Amino acid sequence: AKGLHYDIPIVPQSQYEVGLVTKSFSDSTITITVLNEYEQLQWCVLWQDTRATKSVEYNPSDDQAIISIEPAWRESKGRSFIRVYAHANGKQLNDLLIPMQDGKVVNDVAELTRFDDHAQILYSLMIDRFHNGNKNNDWKMNSPEVLDIVDYQGGDIAGITKKIKEGFFDELGITTIWISPITQNPWDAWGMYPFPNGNKYDSTKTYTKFSGYHGYWPIFTTEVEKRFTTEQELHDMLATAHKHSMNVILDYVANHMHINSPTLQAHPDWHTDSILPDGRRNFELWDEARLTTWFDVHIPTLDLERPEVCSPMTDSALVWLDKFAFDGFRHDACKHIPLNYWRELGAKMKQRYPDRHIWMIGETYGDPALIGSYVKTGMLNAQFDF
């Protein structure tokens, strides 16, 4: 019934176990095979995030569990989902997600669409390294300070469009393409520790500066990277993907900006301190200084706990949804961004796009509790857990 409280335990990854497999279904029941024998197996069954009123029929000596399909489930219209959780003896078994359409269990993959979030097959690509579809935007640095492997290679949005049209993704069964960031990055090279020998370049060494081919050093948060695309090429790629029944999600960087960005030039106090109170350098302290640490000297972490910083940065993210038909975001470095940012972004999205299907997927490395703290109503829909 609505409003009932239930607890789903969070356990270390080592205590997860594959133990549940769907076996069969009828109009009134779903049968699950339990792969091992468990004593005191505890169940939680949800339909549309509301707990089932009937208990799971399970005998530890049997290898099957029976879930009753309740009247409200059978009478529902459109897509709905049953979720099954189980744990026993300190182990959490794999959860099951069972889609329903108009009250009937979906058992044909052809019935799934790009709007079924949990059934997506994602293809992650780095734009610069994928395919070159427009040689007119190829601008390598060709600098003796930059090894070719970390220079721009020519991949672009036009190349993605070409591969969609050729059926590359269709043949793989891809339903969602996750593209690397497309915000404008610096034109010069960065990210190298000082040269030895009086700061002079030595061709016998393998050290190098880096281009921004990866896209994670935004100079502007609302302008496309000219080496990758024009706005029209981006519109064309999104339209082509949707024609092929594919989503496109954008990797978006909110945690930091390049030190030479006009934003930080105008607001030099908008970043966190690079020196800790005890005098240590605040770099790469991923857990100790999770919300303030810098990734590198040239990409300061934004102080997003401050409203005057958080508000315009959430607005910048929304520009990509206002101007382009993206299906969502893969958010970079989520655990280094405070919760107030996600709450504000989620609230603005709900107000601005009440009827639009938008993914919010995050990247967080850490324990299940930290990962799960961002997956809440009005924040992220899901996080990667690897």
Model-derived segments and spans:
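Extracellular ectodomain segments of secreted/surface proteins
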Residues: 6-37
